[in-house]
């Protein structure tokens, strides 16, 4: 998801903005993420029913490309809501997150990215980053966890759990070396302007 331009929302609307993240049908994170209590439709309706809110529904890139099914079939009757903007095209998700007030996910990793940007995240399933006191958990976590800071969650996820390999040398490297290579080699993408 690092291969597209930043998004710029062009709108005169001043309402509270909620970003709702679609996931592909059959995604293991949905299957094993305790998503029985709420459906994708329930999550979207919860967002749409918030007073004075505009909802941005981001379709999964693989769904938008026609490679996998998403959840649009369950929400066709909601697509004409005046406070709903559907984004199907691929874009830099962090640039979109920075322009909203909060993020709703089932179990998508986008919720973790939103936490790292400082946005409130509501989880309608149980992703690995829920239950630590950082998210609004709509589904209770079965095994209570201790409170964590965003920094501690980041360290556990990216520094302790992951191994990094340099894209050129294919040798183990630090996260900093990997990020530096990505920044230096990322092609320039024109910003994507979305009017609403």
What are these regions (language model features)?
Residues 15-27, 59-61, 126:
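Short loop/turn segments at strand-loop or loop-helix junctions that form parts
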